[in-house]
Amino acid sequence: MKPSERRKARRLAVQAIYSWQLSGNNIADVEHEFLTEQSLDGVDVAYFRELFAGVATKKTQLDELIIPHLDRPIDEVSPVEKAIVRLAAYELTFRKDVPFKVAINEAIELAKAFGADESHKFVNGLLDKLVARK
């Protein structure tokens, strides 16, 4: 598997997590929507499914890891940043095969692509604190 296939899976997963967070729709429905309506060229679909389902089913556990490192209530974190840090926290916690530097760098790149101007700094700082605690 090429690293770019996982990168594309992360990108799609962040979009699905974002959609799920905002819509409150069933996980299976959101996954189906993304798998049928998005281009899957070069996407590691199995990894996308794992990331999306993992974040959705472990949201409470992931938030418990994230919240102590926030400078504001989690409800005040933008939905994009929340999706990105939840995905990265999932990889850092449950995917020991993914080096922490890779998980953090990928999250920073996602924040640059989807977040506001300073999102990548927020994501980087938060994930650095999360890794330091482990």
UniProtKB/Swiss-Prot annotation:
GO cellular component: cytosol
Keywords linked to the UniProt accession: RNA-binding, Transcription, Transcription antitermination, Transcription regulation
A biological-process GO annotation: transcription antitermination
Record bears the keyword Heme: no
Keyword tRNA-binding: no
GO molecular function: RNA binding
Pfam families per UniProt: NusB
Function field: Involved in transcription antitermination. Required for transcription of ribosomal RNA (rRNA) genes. Binds specifically to the boxA antiterminator sequence of the ribosomal RNA (rrn) operons.
Family listed: Belongs to the NusB family.
HAMAP family, per database record: NusB (MF_00073)
Protein name, entry field: Transcription antitermination protein NusB
Originating species: Shewanella oneidensis (strain ATCC 700550 / JCM 31522 / CIP 106686 / LMG 19005 / NCIMB 14063 / MR-1)
Organism classification: Bacteria, Pseudomonadati, Pseudomonadota, Gammaproteobacteria, Alteromonadales
